[in-house]
Amino acid sequence: GNGILGKKVEYVTGDTQTKSDAARASARSMIEKDGAVMITGGSSSGVAVAVQALCQEAGVIFMAGLTHSNDTTGKDKKANGFRHFFNAYMSGAALAPVLSSNMGDDRRAYHLTADYTWGWTQEESIINSTEGLGWETVNAVRTPLGAGDFSQFITPVLNSGADVLV
């Protein structure tokens, strides 16, 4: 084809390894070595937040990929950062009325949250939205990223007085 607006478009790829430092290094190489004027990607919220910050420093457009954290585009309100997926705030706002409709307004919730930026903003968004509809948050506990066995968290949930686990 003729490119975009008559200009040839070329692309390069990099590997984030789903690690913030590796993602920043890869993005920096694309900007400095390859002359990238736009970067897209970020398959995790931590990666996207890190690359977003670098792109803002470099004046390069960043189009966030699969990142759900509010912090990707909302926290620092940067001019060059965009997303094409929904965020945690939207999830909380959409989920709370459904939970309330199906479970009632007088609930006590216990939150188990993945301990990184997506989990933190998801927890905050759901708590704000459900408490706005009358729910009470009994506890919010952060679980180690990558944990596969959550059995240690079950007894505290059962003893908390909560009637909903989020």
Language-model features: where?
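Subtilisin-like peptidase catalytic core
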Residues: 10-20, 113-117
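A structural preference for short, hydrophobic beta-strand core positions in alpha/beta folds
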Residues: 11-13, 139-142
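Residues that mark the start of a beta-strand
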Residues: 10, 107-108, 163-164
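Hydrophobic alpha-helical
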Residues: 45-56, 149, 155, 160-166
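Signal peptide-proximal N-terminal region
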Residues: 1-11, 131-135
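Extracytoplasmic ligand/sensor domains, especially the bilobed periplasmic-binding protein
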Residues: 33-141
